[in-house]
From Swiss-Prot:
It holds the Pfam family dATP-dGTP_PPHyd. This is dATP/dGTP diphosphohydrolase. InterPro entries: dATP/dGTP_dipphydrolase_MazZ (IPR007538). Catalyzes the hydrolysis of dGTP into dGMP, which is needed among other for the first step of biosynthesis of dZTP (2-amino-2'-deoxyadenosine-5'-triphosphate). Its EC number is 3.6.1.9. Keywords: Cobalt, Hydrolase, Metal-binding, Nucleotide-binding. One of its GO terms (molecular function) is nucleotide binding. Its cofactor is Co(2+). It catalyses: dGTP + H2O = dGMP + diphosphate + H(+); dATP + H2O = dAMP + diphosphate + H(+). It is an enzyme of class 3 (hydrolase).
Length: 105
């Protein structure tokens, strides 16, 4: 059975908290940026385990900050759906500045 986001967050916290109970959001963000940099530079960018490193840190950050990930993603998707989008030169999508941008509640 697939785990919910909250279940994954709890599993990650149960693993990492005993290893680093004093971790702080700033340190987690720094490590997240490091992992993203490695993913970009790596020939393993399509490796699910490398992507998982990034997701584990992002979910741990959300836990540290008290973010309800499911609620935040749904709210952000609603904002993104209301925006106009264009393809950037690197192939990624970017929203067009000034397009509909309601704020997060």
């Amino acid at each position: 059975m697939p785990a919910t986001v909250a279940e994954l967050q709890a599993e990650i916290a149960a693993w990492i908290h005993p290893l680093n109970p004093d971790r702080r959001p700033g340190g987690t963000i720094a490590k997240l940026l490091e992992e993203i940099g490695e993913l970009i530079a790596s020939d393993r960018a399509h490796d699910p385990l490398e992507v998982a490193d990034v997701l584990i840190l992002a979910l741990d950050l959300a836990t540290l900050l008290g973010v309800d990930v499911t609620e935040a993603i749904r709210a952000k998707l609603a904002i993104n759906r209301a925006r106009s989008w264009a393809r950037a030169d690197n192939g990624a999508m970017r929203h067009i500045p000034g397009s509909d941008t309601p704020s997060f509640p």
